[in-house]
Amino acid sequence: MEDANLLPDLRIEALLNGEAVVVRENRKAGQYVDAVAQWAEDAGLKVYCGRANFHTGHRKSKWLNPYSLQKLGRDEALRLHRETLGDELKDQVGELKGKALSCWCYPEKCHCNYLAELANAK
């Protein structure tokens, strides 16, 4: 799947077909603002791909983008992530196939789009 920013029902269909998709991590009143993120979490298919966050209780993910969007800008941070993703992680990217890759960026461009692209190519 080339475009991870699909309508909710198409992203769920993609997950059911074993493809990786991107979802938004943000919650309001305990529920995800992205219905696909909630569905994927309930189904045990959500993988958090971001930094540690004390306020939300998220632990640092091995899939995080180490380059700051705030400091470098989105395009530069994504370019650096794409260019420097290590071979060890590239070898493990197959474990993301059929998972909802969760980050705070969605629906904006995100490093998870690249991870989904790699996973879906496996």
Functional labels for PLM-detected ranges:
Residues 2-122:
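Catalytic phosphate/metal-binding cores of nucleic-acid and nucleotide-processing enzymes, i.e., regions
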